[in-house]
Amino acid sequence: MSLLTEVETPTRNEWECRCSGSSDPLVVAASIIGILHLILWILDRLFFKCIYRRLKYGLKRGPSTEGVPESMREEYRQEQQNAVDVDDGHFVNIELE
């Protein structure tokens, strides 16, 4: 039997797991790693725009715009925003007959 699977057996009152009371360190470590992985995955999906911008530019808000005319700054901001935003217009509708 695998250490990471639980076998459920019917009893008179309810379902119970055979390894639910296990104190095996490997089972405990696998459970902790699984829970941490799930939490990190959820946070990544919720905040992926912020996280990847922070990794790309560090603690700065973006590349320096010193000496760049305001019109070019605005154009650059629009390009960056459009690159990050999800475009819903690219979905394809397929009709089955």
Swiss-Prot record:
UniProt gene name: M
Comment on protein domains: Cytoplasmic tail plays an important role in virion assembly and morphogenesis.
Activity regulation: The M2 protein from most influenza A strains is inhibited by amantadine and rimantadine, resulting in viral uncoating incapacity. Emergence of amantadine-resistant variants is usually rapid.
Source taxonomy: Viruses, Riboviria, Orthornavirae, Negarnaviricota, Polyploviricotina
InterPro entries in UniProt: Flu_M2
Positions where lipid (S-palmitoyl cysteine) attaches: 50
Species of origin: Influenza A virus (strain A/Chicken/Hong Kong/YU562/2001 H5N1 genotype B)
Additional information: When the channel is activated, one or more imidazole moieties of His-37 probably become bi-protonated.
Site (Essential for channel activity, possibly by being protonated during channel activation, and by forming the channel gate and the selective filter): 37
GO biological process per UniProt: protein complex oligomerization; symbiont genome entry into host cell via pore formation in plasma membrane; symbiont-mediated suppression of host autophagy
Protein name per UniProt: Matrix protein 2
Keyword terms: Disulfide bond, Host cell membrane, Host membrane, Host-virus interaction, Hydrogen ion transport, Inhibition of host autophagy by virus, Ion channel, Ion transport, Lipoprotein, Membrane, Palmitate, Phosphoprotein, Signal-anchor, Transmembrane, Transmembrane helix, Transport, Viral ion channel, Virion
Transmembrane segments annotated in the record for this chain: 23-43
Subunit: Homotetramer; composed of two disulfide-linked dimers held together by non-covalent interactions. May interact with matrix protein 1.
Residues where Phosphoserine is found: 64
